């Protein structure tokens, strides 16, 4: 039998529904693993162990009586600490909000609870989802379970580290410039940035209003699809939310991909930002594997990463400055150095800069839409390198921008990152799949074809 800490959320939910697994048994195993490993990983800012165990007992009583709340009944979940959980701190990993306690759940948290999931606690993040990894804050940064000397990616760092290490099977992350997909890439898990507007952001502390997304982080494609089914839906309380027909993303995952058209954006990692040779080789292997699975793979071109990056920088930092300006004027010393520097940069962009960036953004959206008119899915790099050491500021800064994730925050298209292999140094390599707006089902289908062929869902760090 699979060890409980490596059990998928889908399998755990099925076992609980069939009365083959007790929610208390699962919670006990995970809390023991958290107690043993988290002092090295720092995935949690606030572990709510007593409340989680009480919720597991209630879930067990309900399951015994055949009363299941939903498809995640009794399954533990971790929440990134920029998302409100009633009665728990929402600190955003910052001194600014260290005493802030939420009075209600974020909509994404409420949806998970309604589906039966049990909140374990709040997870480490880069400060305000932009600064980090930082050592000048009240809480230490999360570390990579594949090698704790290395960065787990960010800003959803605790989410990535905890899922990869088997502390929980699923977590919530947010993605404004790649913050779900970066930890997914560094930690070898599955993370999706859904289509802009598909998942409500109400109750989530904003970084940049027009770029923010909420997304699921899991060890398998099936779990990610199931979690997104729960999270998706229109919320009138989020001005960016879009009303679309609800999809059952977990259905059809095992369909073959014969005839599916995949556009390979080679120039991202070969020309625009030359990748580590191991990353390049891994991406070529993914492309060949999809061809063997029946997909039609061909090269496709988009505007350069430099163009996408320039637009993202102006919009993200301008919008972040608009949010943080009052605190930065009154309490600059309460910010960590990295967050302060990155947000302050937004003060130097003019209204004209912002308008021009938004104008160019429309052209970039049209370019990606046109590419996806020729193919069904795009394949490209996520990170250009394996995870860097966490204690080397120069490496952290260098790898911060060596990625191909921000284009799809700019355009809003759904983008999924997952493991593409393991480096000679024992760290995950990654791939990114991008789809048409609200075509997450196709994205999951392609990701599952790769996962099934490569067995990435069975590769875990050796941390014990």
Question: What residues fall within each predicted segment?
Answer:
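Short glycine/serine-rich loop/turn segments
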Residues: 72-214, 321, 380-396, 461-462
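Acyltransferase
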Residues: 23-28, 57, 248, 277-300, ...
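Short, well-ordered beta-strand elements within core beta-sheets of diverse protein domains
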Residues: 12-18, 97-101, 212-219, 344-349, ...
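Serine-dependent amide/ester hydrolase catalytic core
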Residues: 11-17, 31, 61, 258, ...
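Conserved hydrophobic/aromatic pocket- or pore-lining residues that grip, position, or stack substrates
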Residues: 30, 52, 74, 80, ...
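Structural helix-boundary/capping segments
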Residues: 36, 110, 114, 164-268, ...
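An N-terminal boundary/leader segment
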Residues: 1-54, 292-294, 353, 459-464
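Short helix-loop capping/hinge segments that flank enzyme active sites or metal/cofactor-binding pockets
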Residues: 72-92, 251-266, 315-365, 369, ...
